[in-house]
């Protein structure tokens, strides 16, 4: 199918590449070594990946709907009450889709449309009702969210075109569906 080969598969591959770059940028955000440049770079990588996701929303049929991937990646609105509750037990597995995906990462990385200040990650958050949340916990949460996001982006890609062995292995390791029965 020309649409799959020329549009859908390349778009999802590029989305995977962009989310990998975001994952790499988030990996530089450790509480002790974080700099404003690291935060700004992660924000730029987020915007690039998010833009690619927006392009892919033109074809949310097939695997995106068959396997409920879209709500997992792009739930809106972010459930801040559930997110705050999660930070009360940050070692728990994140099962609530309303605190995963792009909007969760956006909340961690940005305030009022601008990259957050590095000081907020070195101390406590300044967002209303989140001032009791440590920036270090937010960074750990962001790492869990990006890993989950990456797996689901890979799931989209390999569901349409399972030729990338590395990404297919990641999807299988995460026990995600990529083929209909």
Which residues fall in each region the model found?
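Mature extracytoplasmic or organellar-lumen-exposed domains after removal of signal/transit peptides
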Residues: 1-181
């Amino acid at each position: 199918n020309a649409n799959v080969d020329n549009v859908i598969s390349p778009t999802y591959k590029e989305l995977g590449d962009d989310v990998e770059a975001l994952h790499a940028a988030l990996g530089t955000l450790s509480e002790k070594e974080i700099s404003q440049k690291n935060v700004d770079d992660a924000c730029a990588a987020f915007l690039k990946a998010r833009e690619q996701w927006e392009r892919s929303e033109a074809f949310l049929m097939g695997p995106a709907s068959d396997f409920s991937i879209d709500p997992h990646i792009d739930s809106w609105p972010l459930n801040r009450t559930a997110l705050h509750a999660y930070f009360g037990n940050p070692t728990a597995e994140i099962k609530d889709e309303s605190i995963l995906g792009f909007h969760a990462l956006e909340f961690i990385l940005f305030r009022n449309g601008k990259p957050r200040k590095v000081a907020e990650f070195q101390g406590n958050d300044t967002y209303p009702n989140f001032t009791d949340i440590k920036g270090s916990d937010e960074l750990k949460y962001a790492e869990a969210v990006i890993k989950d996001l990456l797996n689901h982006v890979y799931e989209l890609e390999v569901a349409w075109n399972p030729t990338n062995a590395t990404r297919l292995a990641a999807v299988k390791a995460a026990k995600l569906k990529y083929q209909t029965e």
